[in-house]
Regions:
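Short catalytic/ligand-binding loop motif for oxyanion handling, primarily in non-cytosolic enzymes
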Residues: 11-14, 46-49, 73-77, 88, ...
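Metal-dependent phosphoester-hydrolase catalytic domains
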Residues: 152-163, 170-266
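Short, Asp-centered acidic motifs that coordinate Mg2+ and/or phosphate
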Residues: 1, 36-37, 120, 161-163, ...
Length: 266
């Protein structure tokens, strides 16, 4: 099985420059990689989900969004391939506490792999971003604890592994490591470090790609890591490969590069 995760940059720049070619670039990468699951962050209803090529529209020939009734406000959507997995249960919730436009949230699903009958839970999430006070750091830990509560509920009901994908706004940055650290304390494993084949690359750039002549080009190389894929009940899966997709196309699509995780259910 395969997951594609990316913060696709909500972008509140001048109207007409919001998305341009970026959704198309993201679609091309997804259709080339062919993941079972696509997790997004900053999927802004007013930019990424609107205009001539809304992300949900250009993916719909191959992918279905869970809880589409929340599409008008869900910045962290989760899409799946119905030909390979089916939904057993799913949900969406914005985090309590500090939030902006309810963009810090989680979309989740429990899925059955059709070829094996085995279950896996997948979550797309985005933690609080500010770094102005100790309360901001505490908010990211609260975000992690909300995910922990969900993980324990799903484990009790379905007994399957959970894979959490997203921008935790945590790392060797001004935000600090709190959100990521809390996830590890809860019992999540960073798949970067448990995969048979792995990539130690950065995931995010502090500069945005350039808008020029109607499209985005020349994205910078990443220089920090705040995006992660983490597994709960990791012993129930075989982590085969983790990598950061760093190409001219991926760098032009967002300030965050896609994370790809290949795994098998045990």
């Amino acid at each position: 099985m395969r997951i594609y995760d990316q913060n696709i940059w909500g972008n509140f720049s001048a109207e007409g420059q919001y998305v341009a070619n970026r959704n198309r670039l993201i679609k091309e990468m997804i259709f080339d990689i062919k993941p079972e699951f696509c997790c997004f962050q900053e999927c802004n209803p007013n930019t990424s989900r609107s205009g001539a090529e809304p992300i949900q529209e250009i993916l719909k020939t191959a992918y279905v969004e869970i809880k589409p009734e929340y599409s008008c406000k869900n910045y962290t959507p989760l899409f799946y391939d119905p030909k390979r997995v089916e939904v057993a249960e799913c949900g969406y919730f914005p985090f309590e506490g500090f939030n902006d436009l309810d963009s810090k949230s989680a979309s989740w699903g429990v899925f059955k792999e059709l070829s094996t009958g085995k279950n896996v839970s997948v979550v797309s999430t985005h933690f609080w971003w500010k770094a102005e006070s100790a309360e901001d750091e505490m908010q990211r830990r609260k975000n992690a604890k909300a995910i922990a509560k969900l993980a324990k509920e799903i484990d009790k009901k379905h007994g399957c592994p959970m894979i959490v994908c997203g921008d935790l706004n945590s790392g060797d940055t001004e935000q600090g490591i709190g959100g990521y650290d809390e996830m590890l304390k809860i019992g999540f494993k960073d798949v970067r470090f448990i995969s048979d084949k792995s990539d130690n690359s950065y995931t995010c750039c502090t500069m945005y790609p350039i808008y020029e002549n109607g499209k985005y080009i020349n994205g910078e190389q990443p220089n920090q890591t705040i995006d992660y894929i983490l597994a709960y009940n990791a012993e129930q899966l075989k982590a085969k490969e983790f990598f950061v997709l760093n190409t001219e196309k991926s760098r032009a699509s967002s300030d965050h590069l896609p994370l790809i995780f290949n795994f098998e259910l045990i």
